[in-house]
Amino acid sequence: MSHIRFNPVSERKHVNRFTEDGENIIKWLGMAKPYLSILMGPAGCGKTQAVEEYIRRNNLTAEHVACHPGLEANDITGGYTPEVGPESQPLIGWLDGPYTRAAKEGRVMLLDEITRLNQQHVGKLMSSLDETRLLTNPESGEPTIKIHKDFHVIATANPPATGYNTVNLDEALKSRAMIYKFIDKPLCDERATLMDILGGDQAYVDAFMKWAEDLRSDASTAISTRDLCYLAKMVGRGFTAMEAIDLNYKDKVSDDKKGVVLTGASAHFEN
């Protein structure tokens, strides 16, 4: 079968473009500062990109933690670490973690995929997220840390029980969030972004968007914005769409849905 004709281009840089919903999220994060904001939604829908754009537009500094079940307390709030003394002797000293640094210095604290974080660590953060705005850290020699007025915690989360290695968010944590928003649509303006990546090739952009719409009619095959952009970048590097889909996306769905993915792609990208 022949493929849609496309002139391969070197990978193009593109700026983040957001939908109206995405722009609203960026605006609302600023309005909610310094209170906790939690954005819940499937992987690749643009949650973290929207947070990063909020940070960039407002010229803020941020600390980042990519949450996972094996994360230790010292990865978040800090811990004792070995260091070398003035006479080259081994010492043990306290080192603030990213959360503590952000709390002291008034930075944004991005907790990415917080539903993968061990709940005992979440409990330690509670008092820093309510009206008391205090971080208890007795191990450091500073039993109570007064939090900077500009400290702002933003968390992203993948829904539990939907194929992600996640846990339910603590109800006490939810109650501390000024914004607790479920994202059910891509926050990225996908068409504009694909036009950037593919150098304005309208036929290929249309094919990608129609194929993505078909996939999203079934939750088990729904494609994320991230994967859609990866596929477009692969096409821009010279892969055919079918090659890109076979290498990037086909094996991300269950075996019984692989045929659906490939048949749908063939209908849009081959003639």
Task: Tell where the protein language model's regions lie, with residue ranges.
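C-terminal regulatory/interaction module of P-loop NTP-utilizing enzymes
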Residues: 1-271
